[in-house]
């Protein structure tokens, strides 16, 4: 009987620690969605076209993030998907940094410009391990667009503003 009591206390204590950790990492934080006007911006990085599960994409993200952390790329680390990544087997992705000024890209990098306009912005402040998946966030964005009679451009941009803040920006074409 004494061993069972110790197990119950031990498991309860572990459960409390896990609950508190989940809370502190932002596990109960909701995605905030709003309509915002976005000024013209640029993304400088490297492009990938292929399967989303291709290891080459993972390597590209890691290498580009390293260049960003080493100061070779300025701005906000971002991943731009041309088309909804949840709806296609083949993806076109630009991995790099977002900035408001046009720059001369480093060797082997490209720069895309994005016009000013209305965007749907979804933000979450949570550690990536407990944050909603990109698929869940994209579904919420699409639901928001439908509720507000908005048509999305097929561009999904994930900005990693802080360790605990991920922002997804999706340009809006026009009202239906």
Predicted regions and their residues:
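A solvent-exposed interaction/effector surface
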Residues: 2-176
């Amino acid at each position: 009987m004494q061993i069972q009591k110790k197990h119950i206390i031990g498991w309860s204590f572990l459960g409390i620690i896990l609950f508190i950790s989940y809370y502190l990492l932002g596990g109960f934080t909701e995605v905030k969605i709003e309509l915002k006007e976005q000024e013209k911006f640029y993304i400088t990085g490297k492009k990938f076209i292929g399967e989303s599960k291709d290891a080459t994409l993972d390597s590209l993200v890691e290498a580009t993030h390293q260049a960003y952390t080493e100061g070779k790329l300025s701005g906000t680390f971002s991943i731009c998907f041309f088309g909804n990544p949840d709806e296609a087997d083949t993806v076109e992705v630009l991995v790099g940094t977002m900035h408001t000024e046009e720059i001369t890209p480093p060797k082997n990098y490209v720069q895309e410009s994005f016009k000013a306009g209305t965007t749907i912005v979804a933000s979450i402040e949570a550690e990536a391990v407990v944050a909603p998946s990109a698929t869940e966030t994209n579904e919420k964005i699409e639901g928001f667009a439908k509720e507000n009679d908005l048509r999305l451009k097929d561009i999904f941009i994930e900005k990693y503003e802080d360790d605990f803040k991920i922002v997804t920006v999706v340009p809006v074409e026009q009202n239906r």
